[in-house]
């Protein structure tokens, strides 16, 4: 993102922590996903083989030797500066193993201390067998953009940073970027506003700029090909805020490009995400374009930013994701219930605690340090809640019966439009008795862009619909 940011914290009156030990009415929940193993659940934290949050933003996927490799920005909750690029691997796109930080912060230069590193993309060069990584580098004010590149002999690194990516002898001084590899092995660099560069045979430089400024105002570029038609996706420029992304089509990478419009219903803000990549998902003899989007959460990107991955419908130049699926089966490309063997812990019969207000069947609070401690039995717990324009961050923790914290993270309840959905399914623990703790932090996702325009929430509200105790799930 070509933007600078300012975090604002909203404070409200301090109240003491509240311990809620109450009897919840149990309601059975159907579980369509019980026998499925390859489930993607959007808009919630994903956990890797170490039980840590999958931290790979602005990402891409490379399929190599029968395995999927996810590369992304390894984000921090404390700073927007470059920390490193991460790599995860999977054999099913659902369960991820942390490989390593494949490109760490450098001692100096474009990716040195107090620099920006974003939009990491990786391609395997057909002519050399080398893996080449591309990224946007910048200063923290986003006033020194430059495309950089790194190389590795193995897909999971470590990658060696090679410096600025050039056309001729000139560095390409741009910011938001993507890549596309055609079926003939030709590689392309995609740039904000719609520039397209064809890469050299070894992928180490740009050979020619094929298209210039065909999408003014567009960023987060991504491209794919389906049945001989090229699709070029962009978002609008609204800082970390979500917007309605759009696409163009062409019979060749060099154009002519024709605007196709939105690919998600207007006003849905691309299901609260921003395009980062389109992965060609093989299904038998067919290839399905899988949209990959970021649900940013500034300033707490490491903890609270999540992902939206969805199969796209591309037919004769028409592109769409007609409806949002929070959870879907990769094998069948169908929507499923994300929760297995769940019991809803109804909030309706709970007594109203200080700091929490009942609104119908919801419990809400915007008072900093307001706490709910909810006993549950099972292996996991899920929170279903409403994100809206007043939402803030909740600190969600799982404690054992002795009060030891087993897991803790921030969850974002902000959205420009009201949306009730699963906000988190906690990591899985041994079956037993636990406490789910939900605490209002008093912090809002708020930021400004270079023009000092303000974005984000106007409060720090946490709105709970249901708590679900889970005995078994594939998430």
Question: Which residues does each predicted region cover?
Answer:
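Glycan-recognition surfaces in beta-rich domains, encompassing non-catalytic CBMs
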Residues: 331-472
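Polar/charged alpha-helical tracts
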Residues: 5, 50, 401-402
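Residue-level detector of functionally pivotal "anchor" positions at catalytic/ligand-binding pockets or at interdomain
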Residues: 475
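Carbohydrate-active catalytic/glycan-binding domains of CAZyme proteins
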Residues: 32-356, 364-366, 370-375, 380, ...
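Intrinsically disordered, low-complexity regulatory regions of eukaryotic regulatory proteins
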Residues: 6-7, 292, 437, 463
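Bacterial Sec-dependent N-terminal signal peptides
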Residues: 1-35
